[in-house]
């Protein structure tokens, strides 16, 4: 397999952001890995990190609301094929707070960890498989995926094949 380390896509609106999340889930399902998968979601306030998370979580068969974990730090979704942990570390004042909540216990097998504002937990979080950078592009968004591990490269390679 050729190493593929970057991928970008123009996202027109909120619906397209959710569809892109579903596309990522389709690729993850094709890989059929039981490993923990970690995405760092990077972008300014309002760029669509939580919207992308909602698209991913709903594509994994969650039928309820997907809310931002800004005040709770983490929302857990125990779904049929995978557990998803959606973190929002924006309000984290000290990375050591993550130790008190048992952060290392979240990164176990067969889970997907979506982490907004990961830089606030630097040194205590699992390594990201994918860095997901969401950038304003006028009223739309540009998403850039950067592989940080072999698993991240596999995700991007599959994604590239499907588009």
Regions from the language model: what does each represent?
Residues 62-78:
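Short beta-strand-centered segment that lines the nucleotide-binding/catalytic pocket of NTP-utilizing
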């Amino acid at each position: 397999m050729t190493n593929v380390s970057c991928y970008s896509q123009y996202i027109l609106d909120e619906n397209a952001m959710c569809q892109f999340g579903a596309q990522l889930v389709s690729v993850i399902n094709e890989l059929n890995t039981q490993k923990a998968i970690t995405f760092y979601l990077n972008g300014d306030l309002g760029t669509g990190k939580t919207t992308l998370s909602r698209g991913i979580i709903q594509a994994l068969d969650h039928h309820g609301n997907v809310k931002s974990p800004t005040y709770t730090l983490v929302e857990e979704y125990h779904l049929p094929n995978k557990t998803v942990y959606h973190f929002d570390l924006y309000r984290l004042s000290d990375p050591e707070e993550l130790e008190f909540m048992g952060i290392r216990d979240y990164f176990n097998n067969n889970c997907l960890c979506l982490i907004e504002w990961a830089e606030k937990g630097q040194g205590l979080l699992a390594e990201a498989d994918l860095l997901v950078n969401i950038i304003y592009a006028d009223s739309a968004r540009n998403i850039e995926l950067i592989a940080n591990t072999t698993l991240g490269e596999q995700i991007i390679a599959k994604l590239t094949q499907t588009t």
